[in-house]
Amino acid sequence: MHKRNGPQAPPGRGAVTARQLGLLVDFSPDGLMIPEDGVNDEELEAEFLALVGGQPQALEKLKGKGPLPMEAIEKMARLCMRDLDEDEEGTDEDVEADEDLLAELNEVLGEERKAVEPAMPVVQPKPSSPNPGIEATLQERLILYQSAVESARQAGDSAKMRRYDRGLKTLENLLVSAKKGNTINEADIPPPVASGKGPAIGHSHTHTTSHLAPVSPPAPEPSVTLEAPSTTAQTSAKPQLSPDPCSPLARLQSLQHEYKVAALRAKHQDDTATAARYLRVSKSFDPVLEALSRGELVDLSRLPPPPDQLSPEPPLPAAQPVTPASTLTRPEVPQPPKNLLEALEQRMERYHVAAAQAKAKGDQRKARMHERIVKQYQDAIRAHKAGRAVDVAELPVPPGFPPIQGLESAEPSQQSLVGVLETAMKLANHEEGSDEEEEETPKKNTPAASTAQPKASPSRAPPSGPAPAGKAASKGTSTRAQQQLAFLEGRKKQLLQAALRAKQKNDVEGAKMHLRQAKGLEPMLEASRNGLPVDIAKVPPAPVNKDDFVLVQRPGPGMSQEAVRRYGELTKLLRQQHEMCLNHSTQFTHLGNIAETIKFEKLAEDCKRSMDTLKQAFARSLPTPAARFEQRTFSVIKIFPDLSNNDMLLFIVKGINLPTPPGLSPSDLDAFVRFDFPYPNVEEAQKDKTSVIKSTDSPEFKEQFKLCINRGHRGFRRAIQTKGIKFEVVHKGGLFKTDRVLGTAQLKLDTLETACEVHEILEVLDGRRPTGGRLEVMVRIREPLTAQQLETTTERWLVIDHIPAAVPTVTGPKAKVPLIPASSKEAGNRSSRPLHSLSVLAFDQERLERKILALRQARRPVPPEVAQQYQDVVQRSQWQRAQLEQGGAALRREYASHLERQLHFYTEAARRLGYDGSREAAKEALYRRNLVESELQRLRR
């Protein structure tokens, strides 16, 4: 057809074109020259480098026939050798977990070390002269790669097979070029691989042990193999960095290499456990080598021995560099502090160390957090040194440190059912004593230090101060952490008591359940003792014993029916108070309010003690104990627990003076109410109606409707804020008459944001015109939508005076009262026995009775001094009453003046104790002063 006319191509042009197309491979330096024809187009070069991931700017300056730099050639070779599928298939974790690849890298590492040493004096590597040993080396590598390809094919590892196949093709090309007499650069020869056969192992061992002192510490990462040329260039540029063969760095590198070779040998012997052990030991050298390369000090006394001398036990970790951050990760709890300042300094130092550790690990966020806490402690220490009060409850507590005030030691945990039940028996028989018992008998293992008295003795020494000071120290549990611990211990005690009761009733399943709940509290108790916050909402509720508020004994024959009825009324009131306390305690527990929870727990315990007193008096056929009502004010949460979060109750109570249609009288009105709540939308609004109430204009419907809501739904919020509930008052029609709407009313529900109940009396409108009628409605939800509804209520609280279980017998107290003769009724002639306030004597008598009752309930003997005190108080009170009855007006005047002196004495004592900081003792003195003042006023009237 058409012939191509043009100059004939010069001879040899076809071979050049074939080389450019990649058909002929020429590794000579002349073959790497960039020709000046169209192949050297900058656009093609940029496109090629963009495809292989390079930077086009690196080759823009290369013009003419100058050779490419070796760095660019090596980079292009590495990019071409990289397998994209392999990068996608495996991850760093898979590569590191592949023991075959690690062994291969170790052999490569040994071969590179051999190649680095002769290249150190030169600046740029030059092609070596023809060497007859190159062909033998290529033949050996060819056999190794053929075996490796076959092994990878049998193992089904496609990534390794492709990698070895590329190396095999490169070796074949190099071998052909070597046979033609071309110069072969040793750096172009693929490295040896682990073929899994004996000769290959011995060969690699001879190569890897030829050099043990590389310039930089090798790491078992695949990137080391790729960066070997740059490492060689850096080494040749700075030969003075080579370590001394006898230096610690060379010694560690040699020992690490021995462990790697031993791991490879153990792996090929199918001893994977030993291979993994040697590999772990070799990896433990990496941080030490890095520390030595940075010039840090290293303790080499704990280095593991060579592999052949390693004991069968797990090896010790390699020595760590001596740096400021090399501290124990798990700090020990320091000695108990002597004062508040030392406690603050200990905790500040712990957070300072934690900040240093976080910085050393590179965790800047945690380091900044610990530094902020250190600043808080520094401010607290400065405030304490300046004499200002320090709120230690606001300071974070380090893990493992108890709160600064100290906590009671934990009871030993019981591991068996019998042991737990024995502990529960002891706890059930042991009741808390009164406050006065705490004054005289200090608790064991209770610290005496408090924030108000930082210079008090530590918890190891028992308090030796007066009774009020001991009481104040024992009540230093005002912090949240201590309240939390006391609450958890009390709940565990209640659960153990419930388990004991269930076991006594042969309810094994119930006993096991309560024991499991008690054991489940131990992690919370441990965390609370260490100063960590716990979620008390997850604490199981207190078990309730129904028999606690039941009079099980029968009354004696001498008890009247009126007394039995009064006992029943008191029991009912105490049961109601106890249930109310438990309900409020549960609500505050779910909210995490530990202070209010403990408050209602104590009130519930008081109700139980009052019930115990009532039971004892009932069993002994005594008259009802002295009972009184007190006004108690509580802050409670208003909630309707019988409703779920998705329920809303609508109450239509009644209508008041509803309008009547024209021509009908109010007695002819048959009314009902229908409502419309536009949620979830107007089309699917919730609608219903009441029943018809006939013949009245003030019907009482008293009906309730349960509506479905979603508290978090935006449509529900929009419905209660803008729409509400629409009501229609309707007159029921007759047989051929339709229903007639008398008026409408609208209830707004925006109050539910902050309240759980809306109670309104709505005005019935005819359009916009008032009709004079009213409609009473009410809406309830479980709890408010945005915040808790706190209410302050005042209750009439029943308090029963405690009586001792077994009062020490006072033989003939009236016989010991000396009768006052007639002549002694005058002032100054009475007995020399001192007078005391009868109210104060009654207070002391009641206090001693409570103490004796507590001892009896705990099945402990009454101390003789306590019994003697009680007997003395009873005798003094009876004697003084007889004196006042027989003494006349003169003795009463003297008694009044004596009360005035006691009033002044207690006033001064309360003021002095308040200045001294003894708050509890000052409160007691003030209470006695009020008793004397009340008695003096009654006496004057």
From Swiss-Prot:
The modification Phosphothreonine is found at residue 91. Keywords: Coiled coil, Cytoplasm, Cytoskeleton, DNA-binding, Nucleus, Phosphoprotein, Repressor, Transcription, Transcription regulation. It is found in: Cytoplasm; Nucleus; Cytoplasm, Cytoskeleton, Microtubule organizing center, Centrosome. Transmembrane segments: none annotated. The modification Phosphoserine is found at residues 247, 434. SMART domains: C2, DM14. InterPro entries: C2_dom (IPR000008), C2_domain_sf (IPR035892), C2_Freud (IPR037772), CC2D1A/B (IPR039725), CC2D1A/B_DM14 (IPR006608). Residues 467-476 have a biased composition (Low complexity). SUPFAM superfamilies: C2 domain (Calcium/lipid-binding domain, CaLB). One of its GO terms (molecular function) is DNA-binding transcription repressor activity, RNA polymerase II-specific. PROSITE patterns: C2. Strongly expressed in several brain areas including frontal cortex, cortex, mesencephalon, hippocampus, midbrain and hypothalamus. Also expressed in testis and at low levels in pituitary, liver and kidney. In brain the highest levels are detected in hippocampal pyramidal cells and raphe nuclei. This is Coiled-coil and C2 domain-containing protein 1A.
